[in-house]
Amino acid sequence: MKINSLIIVVLLLILTSCGGEESYDYYPKPISGHRIIFPEKAYKNISPDCNYSFDIPNYSNFLLDSLTNTCNGNLVLEQFNATLFLTYIKIDTNLMYNIEYSRKLAYNHSIKADAIEEKVILNPANNTYGMQYKIVGNAATNYQFYVTDSSDHFLNGALYFNVAPNYDSIKPTLNFIMEDIDHLIETIDWK
């Protein structure tokens, strides 16, 4: 009888120590990534001493290629550790060669890509036509495009992140930057 009452007392002590008003439910922390704080969408117009001008995001810097003294430039997106490389070509004779070369540049990443999504660019108001390539997967670049006025000007762009490719990790940032690149393309003004 003494043992039974001792067992009952111990069980009551254990049960009362596990509950009450100060009881806390402990759960393991969920696995999560870093929180990305995106800046507000605001743009500034740049007009380098070249045959084009366009709007760029306020959080970026545009640098012309000073080594080759051409109208090639880099749109540096420092906050996101990314750069949009822009190559300007004055069309002399062969527009189709430049279009095919841009397509090959995009499809060179098909080895690592899960898919390449093409989107036609048609903007008759600004006399701008071209193609966008969204490269899905762990490729070196996930976004490329070319635009032209079909007679004098050709601009090719490729977005690179300065990190090892991991599509799932960069996808939110990529989607944010792609909206700004789309705005850049929409606001191109050929001179």
Predicted regions and their residues:
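N-terminal targeting sequences that direct proteins away from the cytosol to non-cytosolic compartments
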Residues: 6, 17-83, 93-120, 124-127, ...
